[in-house]
Amino acid sequence: MNMYCTLDTETVGGASNPLGFYHLGGIIHNRLGEVVGCFNYIIAEMLPYVLNDDYAKKNLPLYYEMLREGTATLIDTQAHAIEVVNSTLEFYNVGIMTAYNSGFDYCKTMCAELLEGREFIDLWLMALECICQKASYKKFCAESGRTNGKGGCKTNAESVFAYLIGNPTYCEEHTALEDSKIELEIFNACIKSHKKFTPNCHCWDFEGKFGLFPKLPLDK
């Protein structure tokens, strides 16, 4: 049976053309969401860039704590981290990669190598198809202020997970392994919905994507 890997990266250098990832985390699981392993790597070669990035360096205390407590491993380079992760994926027979906005993690970073010979699911597109069309999701976004300023609901992982747990004030940690955990919960909710979803397609490549972005209810 094919196993899955839900993965997240934290990067520096902007979303359009990032310099690379400084934190790589992921969870190995089956289609039922049963977890068999995880990884949590901090990349030494990228730390100087983190120190010069006002956004990224806010979480430096968390990374130092992870390293002190042994909950994360320091790896020298991105390339070495990809090599180690690939070996882990092969060990667990992972055939399907997932990420929230896979078009970023698997197209803008070295994680693209992890898709070689594997299928993928963009959890953003999956959530749009399985969760964000619900009237209750639109109502939640309207009442919690999770809007995009253009008459639409936010559909990022933080907003979708906040809806799933019924916590309008939930804030994503923005560290790779912790964010992978909430993305796995989104995957689980989508699978349990038994709704059709589109595999092997990044959200921004999906032809009907703009019709999927939910609008706020008129009676908000």
Residue ranges and their predicted role:
Residues 9-12, 123, 183:
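Ser/Thr-centric signal marking residues that sit
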Residues 14-16, 128, 185:
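Conserved protein kinase catalytic core
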